[in-house]
Swiss-Prot record:
The J domain is necessary and sufficient to stimulate DnaK ATPase activity. Zinc center 1 plays an important role in the autonomous, DnaK-independent chaperone activity of DnaJ. Zinc center 2 is essential for interaction with DnaK and for DnaJ activity. Residues 5-70 form the J domain. Zn(2+) 1 binds at C147, C150, C200, C203. It comes from Wolbachia sp. subsp. Drosophila simulans (strain wRi). Signal peptide: none annotated. It comes from the Bacteria. The keyword Ligase does not apply. Its cofactor is Zn(2+). Keywords: Chaperone, Cytoplasm, DNA replication, Metal-binding, Repeat, Stress response, Zinc, Zinc-finger. PROSITE patterns: DNAJ_1, DNAJ_2, ZF_CR. Homodimer. Its main location: cytoplasm. This is Chaperone protein DnaJ.
Length: 372
């Protein structure tokens, strides 16, 4: 470290009081502290210099020696990185324990509690018929599973890791600069607090490996689009004995050519003959469960009319009840190209009858108007 004048470093005069020295140091320490200037070597060097200056000038004996003999007279000067001294108390007075806290805090052993694995998502496509009856759906996916060789310990022969000797299991290294405590990640165990001496060859010490998982998922009847099914413990494997995450299966129902769904109700469109719409009758349709049902068509049914079939829709979740089926009739117009000569003659006769009826109604209407 360069031998710069301590008073110049703290930007105070030689007759400065201890309070002035403390105030000056506080300002400069905050300005150049490594936590506020990560990766800035120049700021870190400056911080060391002002800390060394304060360590001498804040002590009456060291200051007297420095004033008489210079740097050589400042016995017990700045020691670089050393154990925490009484300066931690001054640090707490200044900053309330900020910047990683003072050295007075005990070095706790890093928690060895396992880390839970991540939850996973799986998108499953099923048919409307599958949703109606419920199914057991086989699925497969690739994820991190617990290594079966080391049983998740990461060590060869399932030997558990040992405590890091450098950080004593805390995963952090604390060093003292003046009365500032600087805490960094342990470079021996990389913050883990423990070391695997002989890593498992199969998983490389991670305790997990990539593998394909094949399971069967129970999809309940009546399940709706976008619903999710949770399978506990089938997500990503945890580490250090942590539990596995969960698997969430999201259901997507494939478009159906006949039925449209609205919650538990089903809707479909059925073409009917013009004569059936006029005279009424019955039509046979096939429901979602494959059963044939008869639907009554009232006389004079117009195109677009919806006919309700009670409890012929989808089942409700966790219930024996079912929704309804709505049949929308589409009255087909007759195509002359597909009619026989006799059918055309009958239609013409019907047209003449209708025209005569309309004519009589019109004459009756206008005669009433004239009388008025």
């Amino acid at each position: 470290m360069s031998k710069k004048d301590y008073y110049d470093l703290l930007e105070v005069g030689r007759n400065a009081s201890i309070d002035e020295i403390k105030k000056a140091y506080k300002k400069l320490a905050l300005k150049y502290h490594p936590d506020r200037n990560p990766g800035n070597q120049e700021a870190e060097e400056k911080f060391k210099e002002v800390t060394a200056a304060y360590e001498v000038l804040s002590d009456s004996e060291k200051r007297a020696g420095y004033d008489r003999y210079g740097h050589e007279g400042a016995s017990g000067g700045f020691q670089g990185f050393s154990s925490a001294g009484d300066f931690s108390d001054i640090f707490n007075d200044f900053f309330g324990g900020g910047f990683g806290g003072g050295a007075s805090r005990s070095r706790a052993k890093r928690s060895t509690t396992g880390v839970s694995g991540a939850d996973l998502r799986y998108d499953l496509e099923i048919t409307l018929e599958d949703a109606f009856k419920g199914i057991q759906a086989p699925i497969h996916y690739v994820t991190n599973v617990k290594c079966d060789t080391c049983q998740g310990t990461g060590g060869e022969g399932a030997i558990k890791p040992v405590q890091c000797h450098t950080c004593q299991g805390s995963g952090r290294i604390r060093t003292q600069q003046g009365f500032f405590t600087i805490e960094r990640t342990c470079t021996t165990c990389y913050g883990e607090g423990e070391i695997i001496q002989n890593k498992c060859k199969k998983c490389g010490g991670s305790g997990r490996r990539r593998d394909e998982v094949n399971i069967s998922v129970s999809i309940p009847k009546g399940i709706e689009e976008g619903a999710k099914v949770r399978i506990s413990g089938k997500g990503e494997a945890g580490t250090k004995g942590g539990k596995s995450g969960d698997l969430y299966v999201y259901v997507k129902i494939i478009f159906h050519k006949i039925f449209a769904r609205n919650k538990a109700d089903l809707h479909c469109k059925v073409p009917i003959r013009m004569t059936l719409a006029v005279l009424g009758g019955e039509i046979d349709i096939q429901s979602i469960d494959g059963a044939k049902i008869k639907v009554k068509v009232p006389e004079g049914t117009q195109t677009g009319t919806k006919l309700r079939c009670r409890e012929k829709g989808m089942p409700y979740m966790n219930s024996h009840a079912r929704g309804d089926l709505y049949v929308q009739v589409i009255v087909e117009t007759l195509n002359p190209k597909n009619l026989t000569k006799k059918q055309i003659e009958l239609l013409k006769a019907l047209e003449e009858e209708e025209n005569a009826s309309v004519q009589q109604q019109s004459e009756g209407f206008f005669s009433k108007v004239k009388k008025k």
